[in-house]
UniProtKB/Swiss-Prot annotation:
Belongs to the ZIP transporter (TC 2.A.5) family. InterPro entries: ZIP, Zn/Fe_permease_fun/pln. The lineage of its organism: Eukaryota, Viridiplantae, Streptophyta, Embryophyta, Tracheophyta. This is Fe(2+) transport protein 1. One of its GO terms (molecular function) is zinc ion transmembrane transporter activity. GO terms for biological process: cadmium ion transport; iron ion transport; zinc ion transmembrane transport; zinc ion transport. It is a multi-pass membrane protein. Residues 84-92, 159-219, 273-282, 335-353 are cytoplasmic. Keywords: Cell membrane, Ion transport, Iron, Iron transport, Membrane, Signal, Transmembrane, Transmembrane helix, Transport. Residues 34-62, 114-137, 241-251, 304-313 are extracellular. Its main location: membrane.
Amino acid sequence: MATPRTLVPILPPVAALLLLLVAASSIPILAAAQPADACGGAPDQAAADGACHDVPRALRLKLIAIPTILVSSVVGVCLPLLSRSVPALRPDGGLFAVVKAFASGVILATGYMHVLPDAFNNLTSPCLPRKPWSEFPFAAFVAMLAAVSTLMADSLMLTYYNRSKPRPSSGGDVAAVADHGESPDQGHRHGHGHGHGHGMAVAKPDDVEATQVQLRRNRVVVQVLEIGIVVHSVVIGLGMGASQNVCTIRPLVAAMCFHQMFEGMGLGGCILQAEYGRRMRSVLVFFFSTTTPFGIALGLALTRVYRDNSPTALIVVGLLNAASAGLLHYMALVELLAADFMGPKLQGNVRLQLAAFLAVLLGAGGMSVMAKWA
């Protein structure tokens, strides 16, 4: 008889390895960036002539930013994971749906208002040759390809889960699989499942199947969303770490704390619904929380080598930003917002649906305002 342990997929460790490769691959690529500015000057040249260019103050701000952003990330992603102890914040509650909608709005605005504009700025920079970069909208094209590729990966990963899952063949199996959480000790471990159940109802096979399909889908969402977040977090951290512009770094720290906290809440809600074990939750929390501080530290280490307006850096960072934007757009609209708003919880409660819409607008609006400084 298959227990819920057999339903733990093989792909999460692979996804974790991909996250490591994404972060590590940026080191040789960005270290190869040209030390000389192709535009004929040093980066942050406008600030270099004024009070904004202050290397010691910039270093202090960046050293403060690393633990501050780390703590904000940990708090944001862990709040939903600790919500089971608070009845009002449990995943089946209305407040959880509203908070998740707010966080989804933050993720949506991150893609549209922060990451995609940066990609356009990178790939249309005057530091790049006019041909082909100014003659074709590469940022939009790569974002579109990334969204379609995310759909393809989402579909293929879900197919993998569905084909590799065990199928319950008896009432006892149904009762065992009905408990799809992390602990196989719960539910009918004795496997009788005759329906009298000592007051416990045995789930119907169709209900169990639907529950398991949704669980597998939630796990796919977590993996794909985390990859997109990691990519743009490393890029943002790298830019902050390499900059010597105090006027840019100071507001960026505050904006990144806001961004990481609420983006973490969205990711944490998805992790909670995916019902991963403690080890996998820890891995996902670790990668989300440390990627931006890692990017800042990487930027500090490459300050003398990395030039953010060299052609190599502009192309690499611009393409990564465009791909990340397409992924975030798809995940926010399709997997998070559409899935929740078309689901039975919000469809069955108009008041809750309106509250969730308002939360999306507030989250997206707040993150859009942050685009003025970051």
